[in-house]
Every structure is written in C-alpha cells, then in structure tokens.
Amino acid sequence: AASDVYKRQTVHRLLTSMCMRGYVQRDAETSMYRAGMRLCEMSSYIVDNLDVVDRARAVLERLGRETDETVHLVMRDERDVVYIHKIDGGNSAIRMFSRIGMRLPLYCTGVGKGILATCPRSEARAVWEASDVYAWTENTITDEEAFFREIDKVRQLGYALDNEENEVGVRCIAAAIPDYRGRAFYAISLSAPTARMADERIMQLRGPLLRASRDIAQALGGSTGR
C-alpha cells in the first residue's frame, strides 16, 4: 500500500511539472489530463523533420554510395545542431560516435559553421556570444576573431571543415542547405577518420557534397544558386 501511495505521489509530481511546462493540461471539471500545446508543437516539429528526411533521403543515399563515407543531415535548433539522419560509411570499420538525436553547438561543428555562414553577421555574433564556448578538443576555435575569420572563409568557399574541432580523430566537410532566402536551417556533412581525410580527399568529396546540398535544397523548395 505504501508503495502505491509513493507511485501516485510520483505520478502527481510529474504531471504537475508537465502542466507547468505546457506539455499537458488538466481539465478543471473532470480532473482529467490531455496533451498540452507544447506537446502538440513537439509533435509538429517531429513530423516536419521526418518530412525533411524523407525528401532528402534519396540524395543522401546517393551521396553515401558515391563517397562511401559517413553522411549526416542536421537541423539548427537555436545555438545547436541536432542530428536527424545518418548513413554509416562503408569505407571504414571505425564508426562515428554521432547518433540521430544528438545535439552539438553550432560553433564547433562543420555543419554548424556552414549554417552560421548563411546568417547575417549580427545573428552569427549573437549565437557566439550566447554560446558556452570552450575547447572540446585542442583544435576547437575558441577565439572570437579567429572564429569569424573562419565563417568568412566558409562564405567564400561554400563549404565548411571540421578539423577535429569536435571529435579527436575525425575530420568533416560540410555544406549548408539554403532556403529560398539563402538562409540555412539544415546542413549535410561527410565524415571520416583523420588518417584518411587528407586535404586531397577533402577536395575529392567537395563536388559530390555540394551537388547533394543543391539537390536537397531544390527538393525542399529552397535555393539552388551555389
């Protein structure tokens, strides 16, 4: 009996907390609970991104076949990127630690830098200032001036690199997926162990990656101008 009381109290605390955060609502007349607006918003958010993955899937699979490297698709969520799709590369027995649903800061990832390069400079600076900037590895860019020189370089090249800035032993090349305004909320990347990802290999991957970003942008109704 004591166990049942404890369970009811725990459930009540959880429901109260969820009510305060808008995930559920309590009907004052019936005392019954139903889904709140926050939960509905989350459902819509998930469905929207499933749609993006569905539209991008064929291009991502083609990119994986062309390069035999690990392919990622991410979306921006405020100061972070969230991984929403991954295709493991067949070119290495080593598997990236990345996983669908993983969240990382914009500033220390190739995909994040690619996305920030499509933003107005004032917005990119606001993201930097709001981020808890620290060195994930010895290669993470933590100096503000150096970071914005890097963003300017990404704008000029049309792609971004992650030189072991987030994960030691892994190098990435990334490209943003711009919408019709030229702004990006999604990006793709190719990742491989640093030992195989020399500059020459980066240049080999650049063409397939940029073609894929253009094709996904077109599939999503965005820009195809790069």
Where on the chain are the PLM-derived regions?
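Short beta-strand "wing" residues that participate in macromolecule-binding interfaces
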Residues: R26
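Extended hydrophobic
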Residues: T140-A212
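Glycine-centered, phosphate/nucleic-acid-interacting loop/turn motifs that mediate DNA/RNA or nucleotide
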Residues: G22
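Amphipathic alpha-helical effector-binding/dimerization core
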Residues: E29-A130
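Basic amphipathic alpha-helical segments that dock to polyanions
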Residues: S17-M18
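Key DNA-contact positions within bacterial/archaeal DNA-binding proteins
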Residues: Q9
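Short, small-residue-biased leader/transition segments that mark boundaries at the very start
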Residues: A1-Y6
